[in-house]
Regions:
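Conserved nucleotide-sugar phosphate-binding/catalytic loop shared by glycosyltransferases and other
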Residues: 3, 21-82
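Donor-nucleotide binding loops and adjacent catalytic segments primarily
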Residues: 185-192, 196-261
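An aromatic- and histidine-rich active-site surface loop
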Residues: 38, 103-118
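Conserved nucleotide-sugar donor-binding subdomain of glycosyltransferases
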Residues: 65-102, 109-110
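Active-site-proximal region of nucleotide-activated glycan assembly enzymes
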Residues: 121-183
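Structural motif
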Residues: 101-102, 164, 202
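A short, glycine/small-residue-rich beta-strand->loop->alpha-helix junction that serves as a flexible
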Residues: 1-13
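Short, polar loop motifs at secondary-structure junctions
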Residues: 31-37, 107-110, 168-173, 230-240
């Protein structure tokens, strides 16, 4: 699992529920770790399978933690190539030691490179919304040709050796057999399906980069009467940072997030 994306972690939890309900066994969960982020407690508590961490390439944020610093990220990852080779060998060893029949890859780059270099025998299936980028009918917003080519190239790297790519989408799209792409709905946990919606009177969201809290606070100063509850995974912060009666930042907690949603 690519540990950078909280969405990949929650999708893995959803898949776990479905697999266990069908009588399958999950022999291990490998997560690419990053010094910039920590694994949320809700994932570690609810995955209920052995979790193994390995060092994986990641994008470093700028000083204000609002966006990716491309130059810093490239230099950082180049200097750590020897560690990533160790991670590739570790992934291969864990696949063999657990005797897994199927490897499910949630957009982790090193899994694709493991299948390129060491060719594990276990069948691999990839799951992520990003595999829509490879679908022939997917229409991108206008942006640079180089950016699109880079994004598609990275996505293909994660799926090297896979027999199928499950592209998550709320919209129905045809299968693309030549690319091994099957479009499926997002994986929803049973807790979401069991939740009873009610009317709310606040804005709700998740900050991938905690630096954007500055923009939230700025908007709040202009609209002080609008209640807002935002979630982040900012290190060394308490469970709830209450700015005032109308603005709170919560540490990422899946149960609380679903309740507010």
């Amino acid at each position: 699992i690519q540990g950078e994306g909280r969405g990949h972690l929650t999708q893995a939890l959803s898949l776990r529920q479905k697999l266990m309900a069908e009588g399958h066994e999950i022999v291990g969960v490998l997560v690419g770790k990053s010094p910039a982020r920590r694994l949320p407690d809700f994932f570690l508590n609810k995955i209920q399978s052995p979790v193994y961490l390995f060092e994986s390439p990641n994008f470093l944020p700028t000083a204000k933690n609002k966006q990716v610093s491309l130059m810093r990220s490239v230099l950082y990852n180049v200097l750590r190539l020897h560690k990533y080779m160790g991670s590739i060998r570790y992934i291969d060893r864990m696949i063999r030691q657990t005797d897994a029949d199927v490897v499910v890859n949630f957009y982790e780059l090193l899994t694709g490179l493991t299948y390129l270099i060491l060719r594990p025998k276990a069948t691999m299936v990839c799951i992520a919304h990003q595999y829509l980028f490879l679908h022939p009918d997917f229409v991108f917003p206008k942006q640079s040709t180089l950016s699109l080519a880079s994004l598609r190239f990275f996505t293909r790297l994660t799926a090297i050796g896979s027999v199928k790519k499950l592209a998550l989408s709320f919209r129905k799209m045809r299968e693309a057999p030549l690319g091994g792409i099957v479009v499926v709905p997002p994986l929803l946990r049973q807790e979401v399906l069991d939740a009873v919606p009610s009317n709310g009177s606040y804005l709700h969201g998740y900050l991938l980069n905690s630096g954007f809290s500055e923009e939230i606070r700025s908007w709040h100063s202009r609209h002080p009467s609008v209640p807002m509850h935002f979630f982040w995974d900012k290190k060394d912060q308490r469970a709830e940072v209450k700015i005032d009666d109308c603005l709170s930042f919560h540490q990422l907690d899946d149960t609380l997030f679903l309740r507010y949603m």
